[in-house]
């Protein structure tokens, strides 16, 4: 409904122009229009995403190393291990630097020798690890209850949930779709520019969405049976991955092995997403300023590391920094990206591909339907032109409402926006790491 049509549009813009977002608008926009001015929004979005994603990806690598070395064996207080890691700016910086080095190092090798080859290996390894972890979890005694909890729907909680209304659940799902598919910032259009014209884009986008769902389902098959098998609450929330699961693996036979494999799976997924977005950033610089790939790496690598430091310091040195209605440094960066840049960017792609003042519907369909495969459905034109923009606006407005309510409460209570309450580091959307598997699956590096 939302993600696939926009993904098709990003692919079409990239493939028709054979350029990154830096030049794709300029190549396709009607003469006299100014769509190319919006390219900077995409670059800012990619940077914002990486400013906190590299840090979270660093956590996953750190946990893989700790699990492989047996750090969690016999550890009663996993929270102390996690707190010690994010509370140490030097350790956190080290893991972030490792992520940046791996990501830019792979991209520096080029598309075929670097990004394409490494990502193919990582994705193959990812699915092998996932299958092994799924089999292990499904064979655990007591795991059946976890399967029932995970796979049997409870519609009463959907419509009568004290924690969230049905509208809030739908809004969250739409926002999740934008984030998972990395649409709205041009990171998918760059991979569209690498596609040949022998395949129609609708089928490619649908396959990516289905793969996204498959990875999400498999992740649930790994986690929930294990939680029920060892009496762990499945609604432990953000702390589930980094605080609860190490205890679960500790109780398993060969738990050190399974724990290391699980965090290797999460780290591989997250790293493949980092590589994909790094490639979009580098191609933007190469197209916009006409510089070589090596020079683009030399400029963007230190810049991204520097801009990632506020997120690193937000968990320790700047832990007292709070924005009411939003949260800490990482939450602020996520808010600007997920609640603003992603929906606005998605709306711009839709308007560009459906309006006469933009590229236009006819040219979009012509490009999307080149080659063999599934055509973009003709009946979807009205939905894409009017329904999708309406949904995007709903996501944008609903994303701001809770924050505005808090700000208005401060205003009428005579408070100041500098005042703020405590925000636990575990408010971090740790599902980013799991989403990395889905995002990486959404990067068609080579047709």
Question: Model-found features: residue ranges?
Answer:
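Juxtamembrane transmembrane-helix boundary signature
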Residues: 1-30, 226, 230-233, 351-360
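Inter-helical loop and helix-membrane interface segments of multi-pass membrane transporters/permeases
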Residues: 21-41, 54-112, 142-171, 238-242, ...
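Membrane-water interface regions at transmembrane-helix termini and the short interhelical loops
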Residues: 34-50, 83, 87, 98-122, ...
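C-terminal membrane-solvent junction of multi-pass transporters and transport-like membrane proteins
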Residues: 37-46, 289-301, 334-392
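Helix-loop-helix connectors at the membrane interface of multi-pass transporters/channels
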Residues: 57-87, 194-198, 203, 207-215, ...
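Loop-to-transmembrane helix boundary motifs in multi-pass membrane proteins
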Residues: 89-94, 211-217, 256-259, 268-271, ...
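A generic transmembrane alpha-helix motif of multi-pass inner-membrane proteins
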Residues: 93, 327-351, 373-418, 422-433
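Membrane-embedded translocation segments of transport machinery
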Residues: 116, 120-271, 275, 295-296, ...
């Amino acid at each position: 409904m939302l993600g696939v049509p926009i993904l098709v549009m990003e692919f079409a813009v990239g493939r028709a122009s054979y350029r990154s977002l830096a030049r794709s608008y300029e190549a396709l926009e009607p003469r006299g229009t100014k769509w190319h001015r919006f390219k900077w929004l995409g670059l800012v979005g990619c940077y914002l995403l990486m400013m906190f994603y590299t840090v979270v990806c660093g956590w996953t690598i750190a946990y893989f190393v700790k699990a492989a070395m047996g750090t969690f064996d016999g550890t009663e207080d996993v929270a102390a291990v996690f707190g010690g890691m994010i509370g140490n700016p030097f350790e956190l910086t080290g893991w972030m630097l490792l992520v940046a080095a791996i990501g830019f190092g792979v991209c520096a090798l080029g598309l075929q020798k670097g990004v394409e080859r490494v990502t193919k290996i990582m994705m193959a390894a990812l699915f092998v690890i996932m299958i092994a972890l799924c089999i292990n979890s499904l064979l655990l005694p007591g795991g059946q209850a976890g399967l029932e909890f995970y796979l049997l729907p409870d519609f009463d909680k959907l419509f009568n949930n004290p924690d969230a209304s049905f509208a809030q659940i739908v809004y969250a799902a739409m926002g999740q779709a934008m984030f998972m598919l990395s649409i709205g910032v041009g990171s998918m259009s760059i991979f569209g520019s690498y596609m040949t014209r022998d395949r129609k884009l609708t089928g490619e986008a649908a396959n990516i969405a289905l793969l996204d769902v498959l990875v999400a389902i498999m992740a649930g098959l790994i986690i929930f049976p294990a939680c029920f098998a060892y009496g762990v609450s499945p609604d432990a929330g953000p702390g589930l991955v980094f605080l609860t699961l190490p205890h679960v693996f500790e109780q398993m036979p060969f738990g050190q092995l399974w724990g290391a494999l699980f965090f290797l799976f999460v780290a591989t997924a997250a790293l493949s997403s980092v590589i994909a977005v790094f490639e979009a950033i580098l191609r933007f610089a190469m197209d916009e300023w006409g510089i070589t790939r090596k020079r683009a790496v030399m400029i963007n690598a230190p810049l991204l590391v520097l801009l990632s430091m506020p997120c690193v310091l937000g968990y320790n040195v700047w832990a007292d920094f709070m924005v009411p209605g939003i949260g800490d440094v990482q939450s602020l960066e996520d808010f600007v990206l997920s609640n603003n840049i992603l929906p606005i960017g998605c709306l711009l792609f839709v308007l560009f591909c459906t309006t006469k003042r933009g590229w236009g519907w006819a040219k979009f369909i012509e490009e999307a339907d080149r080659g063999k495969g599934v055509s973009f459905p003709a009946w979807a034109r009205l939905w894409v032109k009017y329904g999708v923009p309406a949904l995007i606006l709903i996501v944008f407005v609903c994303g701001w409402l809770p924050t505005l309510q808090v700000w208005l409460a401060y205003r009428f209570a005579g408070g100041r926006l500098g005042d703020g309450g405590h925000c636990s580091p575990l408010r971090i959307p740790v599902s980013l790491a799991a989403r990395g598997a889905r995002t990486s699956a959404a990067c068609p590096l080579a047709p």
